[in-house]
Each structure stands twice: as C-alpha cells, then as structure tokens.
Curated annotation (Swiss-Prot):
Residues 2-37 are annotated as: N-terminal extension. Keywords: 3Fe-4S, 4Fe-4S, Electron transport, Iron, Iron-sulfur, Metal-binding, Methylation, Repeat, Transport, Zinc. The modification N6-methyllysine is found at K30. Residues 38-66, 75-104 form the 4Fe-4S ferredoxin-type domain. Pfam families: Fer4_10. Binds 1 [3Fe-4S] cluster. The keyword Transport applies. The gene is zfx1. Zn(2+) binds at H17, H20, H35, D77. This is Zinc-containing ferredoxin-1.
Length: 104
C-alpha cells in the first residue's frame, strides 16, 4: 500500500520543513508524516533507494537525514517541489509508491 492520494485533505498540516508543508501525524523519529504538497513524499514509506532523485530531470529532491527511522535513515525530501514539471518519473520509479504528484 502506497501513499494516500487524498492526504492533502485527509491529514492535518502539522508544520513546515525546507519551505514545504508537513502532513501529520508526526512522532519522531519513527513517524515522520508526508512532506510536500505538489510533490508529496511519505517519509514513513520511503526506503531511500534514490530512484526518484536519479529520475527527476529538474532536481526536485535532496537527501534529508532521518536517524532512527525504521524504514531508512535518510529520505528523498521534495525541497524544490515548485520546480516540478509533472513528468511523473519519480512516481513511476518509486518501488514502494511513496510519492504522489498533483499540480497546484
């Protein structure tokens, strides 16, 4: 089961990180929520294999350290989500379906 495609309406915004919204719940270090609105990454599903970072032609993602998280200790953070060109490359290569892209 991948990211909830309705997280933008089903979850509360609980904060901001690197210029994008974070949707809860969040209970670090084990529950980190979904980061981003245009390009959402479920940090609790992300296994940090780097597929999305390598596939993105406009460098939407940067590595972010998440020590102590059970899935992986780093995440693909959508820090440049405003640059997204909606090619869906990241969505198509993510092995755990942790990414959802929706134009504003």
């Amino acid at each position: 089961m991948g990211i909830d495609p309705n997280y933008r309406t089903n979850r509360q915004v609980v904060g901001e990180h690197s210029g994008h919204k974070v949707y809860g719940p969040v209970e670090p270090p084990k529950v980190l929520g979904i980061h981003g609105t245009i390009v959402g990454v479920d940090f609790d599903l992300c296994i940090a294999d780097g597929s999305c970072i390598n596939a993105c032609p406009v460098n939407v993602f940067q590595w972010y350290d998440t020590p102590g998280h059970p899935a992986s200790e780093k995440k693909a953070d959508p820090v440049n989500e405003q640059a997204c060109i909606f090619c869906m490359a990241c969505v198509n290569v993510c092995p755990v379906a942790a990414i959802d892209v929706k134009p504003p």
